[in-house]
Amino acid sequence: MDGNDLRNVTGCPVMHGGNTGMNTSPVRWWPNALNLDILHQHGARVSPMDPDYDHREAVKALDFQGVWDDVDKLLTDSQDWWPADWGHYGGLFIRLSWHAAGSYRLGDGRGGAGTGNLRFEPLNSWPDNASLEKARRLLWPVKKKYGNALSWADLLVLAGTVAYSNMGLKTFGFAFGRKDIWGPEIDINWGSDSEILAPTDERVTDVADANSMANPLAASHMGLIYVNPEGVNGTPDPAQTAKYVRMTFARMAMNDEETAALTVGGHTVGKAHGGTMADKVGADPAGCPVHMQGFGWENPGFDGNANTAHTSGLEGAWTSNPTQWDNGYLELLFKYDWEVTKSRAGAFQWEPVNIAEEDMVPDATDPSIKHNPIMTDADMAMKVDPIYREICERFHKDPDYLADTFARAWFKLTHRDMGPKANYYGPFVPQEDLIWQDPIPEGPTGYDVDALKAKIAESGLSAAEMIATAWDSARTFRGSDMRGGANGARIRLVPQKDWAGNEPERLAKVLGILEPLAAAAGASIADTIVLAGNVGIEMAIKAAGQDVPVPFAPGRGDATDAMTDAESFEVMEPFADGFRNWSKERYSVSPEELMLDRAQLLGLTAAEMAVLVGGLRVLGANHGGSAHGVFTDRVGTLTTDFFQTITDMAYKWVPLDDGTYEIRDRKSGDTVYTATSADLVFGSNSQLRAIAEVYAQDDNETKFVRDFVAAWTKVMNADRFDLLA
C-alpha cells in the first residue's frame, strides 16, 4: 500500500478542501457574527426538483382517492422487518402524523408538518421520534408510486388521518398542498439546552411554573414533542404534569378542550414500546453507521415480537382494543385506581389496581396473552387536574361529542401551519370555515385602480405615512405558518390597531382618510392600504428622476372581528422592526438579529433585506420619524444614499451609551448622522457589506430602484395565495 492509497484508514493523505463538517465553518471561529444562512436554506440550489417545478400545479393532478386507498391497504400489510402491532400499523402512523405536526408553535409559527421536516435533523433523530423512520420506510412505496404530485409533507399527515378513519373515527377532513423542503430548518430555535433530554430546568426559570419556559419553545425538553411522559423531569406527578401539558398545548394554539380531546384520542389506539433498557439501544438515524441506512435505534434484542420492540421505554397499550376507535380510554381511566409502576425498560408508567381480565389488553403478537393497560403521567393529568377531568367526564358521557371534538382538533393540529384555505387541495377539504384559518372574504377587483391612486395622491397623506402603514400591514406575514400579511387588513382590528409598533395615532389618521376613499371606489381597505404605499413609493421614485412602476394586484379582502381570533394574533405583535429601525425596549438579542429573524419569516434573501432597509431609511419610514439610519439630505427620494454613506470612509462610527451610534466626519469631527446596529451591520458584516457595495456603485441607481420595488412587491403579496392558486 503506497502513501497515496486512500484505503489507508489510519489517516487521510491530504487535507481535503471541502468543508463537509461543522468544525471548520466560520460560525465556529466567529460565533457572534450575524449568520445569514437562514435566509438561503431552501433555495433552488438545495432542491433536486426542476427549476420550473410548481407543487401547486403538480398536486392538482394527484389521484387523491388512490393515495388514500393505498395508505389504507398498507395499514394491515405487516412487514417482517417491522411487524405491525396486532397486524395494524394504525397506531404507528398516527404517532408519525402527530409528531410531524406537533412540533408547531404559535409564538413564531415555526415547526409543524407543513414542510416534511420530520425527515431531517434534528427532528428525525429526537428520542421522542424513535421508530418513526420505520413508518416513513413503510410509506415509501406509496410516495414512490405517486411521485412529485405527492409530497412527503402531505403523506406524513395523511397516514394518521387514514388510520383514524380505518379504525372507525369519522374524520373532519384532509387537505393536500404541503410543499417539501430538502434540508434541515436551521432558522428554528429548538432551545439552548446543553444536551438532548436535558432537565426542564434548562428552559424554565422556575420548574414549578410551566409558563416560565422561554418563548417560543413549546416542549418541556429538547428532543420531545410535548412533555415527558414519565412526569416533569421524569418524576411522576400528574398535577404538575397537567401544568406543562396545558402550557405546551396552549403554545401550539390549543385550548383545554382540544388538549383533552387530543390526549384521549391520541391514546385510544396503538401502544408504547419498552422492550429493553435504553442503554442497549443503538444510535439515532443521524448518528448511526452508514450501513444502517438511516435506520436508527438498533435493538439487538428485537426478535420481531412487539414485546421486544423499543421506542419510548414505556410498555403497553392504553385500551383493551387498540386498533379500534372507541371510548375505552376513558372507560378504563375512570373505572380503576392507578398506581405508579416501571416498565421492563425502567420507565415510570401507571397501571390499574385489581383490573378485571376482560379489561386487559391482548398481546400485540400473541392474543392468548393478556397485559395490563397503561397510562402516562400526562394521561393521569386528565383525571387529576380538575379542569381536564370535567372535560373528560363530559367526553365519557357523550362519546359522539368526544369524536367530533377530537376530529376537529386533529384537523387543526395537522393543518395549523398551512395558512388559509386557498392553500388547500383535494376532495377531502371540509367546506366549513374555521376561525383559526384566519378566513378572509374574496375582495373586489373591478374597481378603477388608477382613479383610486389619484384620490390617494390628493389625500394630503405624506409618502412616509402611506409607506409605513402599508409596511406595518404586510410585515406580520410569517412564511412559517402562512399567517399574517396585508390581506384582510387586520391592522385595523383588535389587537393590531393598538400595537405600539403600528403607531396607533398615525395609523388611525391614515385609516380615517383611506377608508372613505376605499368605500367610494368600491375597493377593499386592504387593497387601498397597499395601493397607498405604492403611491408613496412611486412619488419617491419620480423625485429621484426614475421611472419604475410599482406593480399592484387588486383582490384583497377585508376581514372582520368575527373572522379574527384576536388572542391568537397577540403573539404576532412585533417588539422590534429593523426595517423601520424600531425596538420597543433594549433586548438581549441584538436589533440586527431580530431584523434577520423578521426577514426570514417574510421569505426574504439577504439582498432583498438590504435593499428594503436602505430604501425605507431614505424614504423616511422609520418608526416615530426617528432619524437613525436616515443617511440622506433628500428624505422622501428613493436614492442609494444609505449605501453610499455606509461604505464611505469619510466617516467614522462612534458608539454611545444608549446603544446607538453617531456617524462623524473624520476630518471635522462633526456628527453627521445617527444610527443603530441594524444600520451599521450593513457595513460591518462581510456579506451585507458586499451587497451594500453593489448598491453604492455609481452604475446601480436604477438597479437599486428596480430591486427595491421587486422586494417591496414581494412583501406586499406574500400572503396573496389566491394569485398562486
From Swiss-Prot:
The similarity comment for this entry is:
Belongs to the peroxidase family. Peroxidase/catalase subfamily.
Traced from the root, the source organism's taxonomic lineage reads: Bacteria, Pseudomonadati, Pseudomonadota, Alphaproteobacteria, Rhodobacterales
Q: Which domain of life is it from?
A: Bacteria
Q: Which Pfam families match?
A: peroxidase
Keyword Glycoprotein on entry:
no
Cofactor needs: heme b
- Quote the catalytic activity from the record: H2O2 + AH2 = A + 2 H2O; 2 H2O2 = O2 + 2 H2O
Gene Ontology CC:
cytosol
- EC number(s) stated in the UniProt entry for this protein: 1.11.1.21
Summary of subunit composition and partner proteins: Homodimer or homotetramer.
Q: Which organism is it from?
A: Dinoroseobacter shibae (strain DSM 16493 / NCIMB 14021 / DFL 12)
Q: Where is this cross-link: Tryptophyl-tyrosyl-methioninium (Tyr-Met) (with W-98)?
A: 226-252
Functional note: Bifunctional enzyme with both catalase and broad-spectrum peroxidase activity.
Site (Transition state stabilizer) residue list: 95
Placement of covalent cross-link Tryptophyl-tyrosyl-methioninium (Trp-Tyr) (with M-252): 98-226
Entry-linked PANTHER family: CATALASE-PEROXIDASE, HYDROPEROXIDASE I, BIFUNCTIONAL CATALASE-PEROXIDASE
GO MF, one term, reads: heme binding
Entry's cofactor comment? Binds 1 heme b (iron(II)-protoporphyrin IX) group per dimer.
- What does the record give as the active site? 99 (proton acceptor)
Q: Which residues bind heme b?
A: 267
UniProt modification remark: Formation of the three residue Trp-Tyr-Met cross-link is important for the catalase, but not the peroxidase activity of the enzyme.
State the protein's name: Catalase-peroxidase
Which key words tag this protein in UniProt?
Answer: Heme, Hydrogen peroxide, Iron, Metal-binding, Oxidoreductase, Peroxidase, Plasmid
